């Protein structure tokens, strides 16, 4: 039994390695991005359901997140390949190029993906272009500031230590919390503005 179990485990690991080679890697990265984005939305919806009695799970919302995530997967796949070609780096000797990769990633890919996220979801959910652009203007800088707080350190580790074929998978592994935040940013309820007169009345009532 023990020997048979080890053989099955080795076969399973060998089969898993195929997912990170050749054309299969593109599929793995694409589906991984979609699945993690949908999972992040699922986590966020679970929190909302607990906080707001009567709210039910919205599968269409998670499906939209999955679709947008899958659309980003090929871009990320080829983006990292391009960065490796432009700024080859191996170990600590490649430290200057690693810093260049992180900077280029933050200045180019991060804002592009932010625009992609809000406009893509807006399109899937029936928003007009004007509505999507208005939402982008309202939320983009909050997204981008949070991105700078999270991803430079993560990408530094990614470019310095993670083998190229595992880079998108590494990011996907870290991204569940980030995708939960993106779902919150996209779907949070707007805070109603209270007229000044109402504030004054409330204050007097206290």
Curated annotation (Swiss-Prot):
Transmembrane spans: 20-42, 63-83, 102-122
Primary localization: membrane
Subcellular location, record wording: Membrane; Mitochondrion inner membrane
Top-rank lineage group of the source organism: Eukaryota
Pfam family, one: Mpv17_PMP22
Topology within the bilayer: Multi-pass membrane protein
Keyword set, alphabetical order: Membrane, Mitochondrion, Mitochondrion inner membrane, Transmembrane, Transmembrane helix
GO terms of biological process kind: mitochondrial ribosome assembly; positive regulation of mitochondrial translation
MF terms (GO), sorted A to Z: mitochondrial large ribosomal subunit binding
One Gene Ontology cellular component annotation held by this UniProt entry: mitochondrial inner membrane
Keyword flag tRNA processing: no
PANTHER family according to UniProt: MPV17-LIKE PROTEIN 2, PEROXISOMAL MEMBRANE PROTEIN 2, PXMP2 MPV17
Subunit structure: Interacts with the large mitochondrial ribosomal subunit.
Family: Belongs to the peroxisomal membrane protein PXMP2/4 family.
Function in brief: Required for the assembly and stability of the mitochondrial ribosome. Is a positive regulator of mitochondrial protein synthesis.
Protein name, as recorded: Mpv17-like protein 2
Organism: Homo sapiens (Human)
Gene: MPV17L2
